[in-house]
Amino acid sequence: MLSLKITTHIYIHATPEQVWQVLTDFKSYESWNSFIRKVEGKLNIGEKLKIRIHPTKQKAMEFKPTLLGVKNAQSLSWLGHFLILGLLDGEHHFKLCSQEDGSTCLVHSETFSGLLVPMMRNNLKSIRKDFEYMNQFLKLFVESKL
């Protein structure tokens, strides 16, 4: 199989707008984000971002994905490639879903595709934990600001 999807979610006791404010404040990432330590770039579709991640079971790495989508207080997505298109691609998504009680469900996912997915499946699966940690730290950070 040449694709793998990792999906996590968490409920945050804050509005989507409040979560969005923190999620898109890239300068604050170093103070709360355990996984994505640095993001440089603007929130414009087509923009090349510069992202530094620190997976718990791998070395830190930097990559330059292209911003695919930005919907204020709703969703954010980018697409990155390892070396060349089709070798190992990752489409990263954050989706903010408003709940009836005024809270937010964050759906945090990535779909990996390409020729290297079968060989890297176990390494890629370990990223689920990093997403879960990041989600938890985001929740704590957002809720502490209320």
Q: How should these model regions be labeled?
A:
Residues M1, K27-N33, P55-A60, L83-L87:
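Short, solvent-exposed secondary-structure boundary motifs
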Residues M1-N44:
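Hydrophobic ligand-binding cavity/cleft-lining segments
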Residues H9-H13, R52, T66, K95:
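Generic structural detector for well-ordered beta-strands
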Residues V19-L23, Y29, L49-I51, L67, ...:
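Hydrophobic pocket/interface hotspot
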Residues V39-T56:
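Generic amphipathic, hydrophobic interface segment in small proteins and small subunits
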Residues E40, K57-S103, T111-S113, L140:
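Hydrophobic-ligand binding "helix-grip"
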Residues T111-L146:
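A conserved amphipathic terminal alpha-helix motif
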